[in-house]
Each structure stands twice: as C-alpha cells, then as structure tokens.
From Swiss-Prot:
Homotetramer. May interact with ABCA1; functionally associated with ABCA1 in the biogenesis of HDLs. May interact with APP/A4 amyloid-beta peptide; the interaction is extremely stable in vitro but its physiological significance is unclear. May interact with MAPT. May interact with MAP2. In the cerebrospinal fluid, interacts with secreted SORL1. Interacts with PMEL; this allows the loading of PMEL luminal fragment on ILVs to induce fibril nucleation. It comes from Microtus ochrogaster (Prairie vole). Residues 274-286 are annotated as: Specificity for association with VLDL. Residues 154-164 are annotated as: LDL and other lipoprotein receptors binding. Keywords: Chylomicron, Endosome, Extracellular matrix, Glycoprotein, HDL, Heparin-binding, Lipid transport, Lipid-binding, Oxidation, Phosphoprotein, Repeat, Secreted, Signal, Transport, VLDL. Pfam families: Apolipoprotein. This is Apolipoprotein E. It is found in: Secreted; Secreted, Extracellular space; Secreted, Extracellular space, Extracellular matrix; Extracellular vesicle. GO terms for molecular function: cholesterol transfer activity; heparin binding; phosphatidylcholine-sterol O-acyltransferase activator activity; phospholipid binding. Residues 262-316 are annotated as: Homooligomerization. GO terms for biological process: acylglycerol homeostasis; cholesterol efflux; cholesterol metabolic process; lipoprotein metabolic process; melanosome organization; phospholipid efflux. InterPro entries: ApoA_E, Apolipoprotein_A1/A4/E. Sequence repeats lie at residues 76-97, 98-119, 120-141, 142-163, 164-185, 186-207, 208-229, 230-251. Heparin binds at L158, R159, K160, R161, G225, A226, R227, I228, R229, G230, R231, L232.
Amino acid sequence: MKALWAVLVVTLLAGCLAEGDPELEPEVTDQLGWQTNQPWEQALGRFWDYLRWVQTLSDQVQQELQTSQVTQELTVLMEDTMTELKAYKKELEEQMGPMAEETRARLAKEVQAAQSRLGADMEDLRNRLGLYRNEVQTMLGQSTEELRARLTTHLRKLRKRLMRDAEDLQKRLAVYKAGAREGAERGVGAIRERLGPLVEQGRQRTANLGAGAAQPLRERAQALGARIRGRLEEVGNQARDRLEEVREQMEEVRAKVEEQAQQMRLQAEIFQTRLKGWFEPLVEDMQRQWANLMEKIQASVATNPIPPSSVPQESQ
C-alpha cells in the first residue's frame, strides 16, 4: 500500500509541475523519454518520429503539406496509438484483483483523463498542420516564411505538450498497474486471513468428530459383521438341507428305476416262456410229419424200382 501511495504522490507532483509556466519547460528532445516496451508506446513513438520529420519542413515536407498526405498519415498513426492504448487499458482492467471500488474508479478516471488529453494533443497537431495547408494555399505566389516560422513555434509547443501528457499517461498507467497488482495481493491475503480460521475450525471439528464417532462406528461394524456371519451360516444350513433333500429324491428315483427294470425283466421272461410254449408243439408236429413223409417216399421207391433205359445204337 505504501508503494502505491508513493507512486500516486510522484504522479501528482509531476502533473503539478507540468501545469506550471510553459516558459519554464525544458526543450523537447528528439527522442521520447522512455523505453517503448508496450505496443501503445511503440505506436506513439512512430507518431513522434513522423512529427519530428514534419517539423524539419524540408522540401518534401513542404510539398506534402500542400496536400492531405501529412494529415492522413497522422490520422492513421493517431488511430493506431489510441487502439493500442485502449487494448492495454482493457488488459490492465482484466488483471485487476480485489480492490476497493472507490480506488478502482478513481484510478480508472485518472487514466481516462490522461488518455483524453493525449488524444486531444494529437488532434491539435493534425488540425494545426491542416490549417497551415489552407494558409499556404491562400498565399500562392507570396512568401511563406512567416507562416513557416509560426508553424515551427506552434509545433514546438504542441510537441512539448504532447511529451508532457504522454509521460503523465505512462505514470498513471504504471500506478494503475501497481494498484492492480497490490490489490490482488491484498485480496489474496485477506482471503487467506478469512479462510485460515475456518480451515482450522474445520480441521478441529473433523478431529473431534473422528474421536467421538470412532466407538459407535466400531460397534456398528461389529454388529454388522455379526449379522453378516449369521446370514451366511443360515444360507449355508439351508444349502446343506436342500442338498440332502435332493440326494434323498435321487435315491428314491434310482430305487423306482431299478424296480421297474426288474419288473420288465420278469415280464420278458414270462413272455419268452409263453412263446416257447406256443411254438414247440408246432415244431414237433412239423418234424413228425416230415419224418412220416420221408418214410413214405423211401417205401415207395423200394417197391417200384426204375428200369434201366435203353439207348438206340447208330447204324454202321
């Protein structure tokens, strides 16, 4: 916080000195007074370099000043600078951590004011060059030395003001960035301070709950284990009873099958005996008839012998 206030004081003092008597301001150097690290600073550097070239009022500059070439170039460079500046400011706003709303609003307002002053300075430079072009066009064929002298004086003053406002904007952006970083660090510290006691309370509560609930949990676990063992024993007994019942049913089935097989064997033997009783008399009768037939045939052959057959001889 001390660092933030120190930067604010330095910025305010610089602004007060810059708003003093213009005659006391030092001559503007040819280069910007800081390193162009940020894109908006680089864009402003290109604007500054082009303006320095215009201030030389060389023959080429004099020729281009009579057209809209210079003002168009300055317009493009000015728009590039403002675009990059807005992007950098938005980036800082996104990085802003927890900070008092009043401080945030004040810093944003100061940066916006400095940004507006810089834009107005660039606009004045462009308008002054446009005015010079109009004056030159109205004095065709006449000497323009006096116009060039006045333009040189105006450009010198405008460049001083541009440099002053650019440095002021850079300082305020530095304060804005420092405030964002310090606000974020302070916010993290405040969050840590608020959460620290809560975390400690939660840790103690967890420890107390663990110590107080250990015994009931152990008893509940033992009771649950006993119920599970009882259920397992009950299921085991039921399984054994069921197995014994199935074994007895299998024995009954086997006995019935053996009994039915014995009955079928007895019935087969009885049927075989009946068949034998049916066919044996028929067989004996057929054998007897066959024997009688053979005897009759033999007796007939014996009583009626067959005479030998005579074969006629062929004549010689």
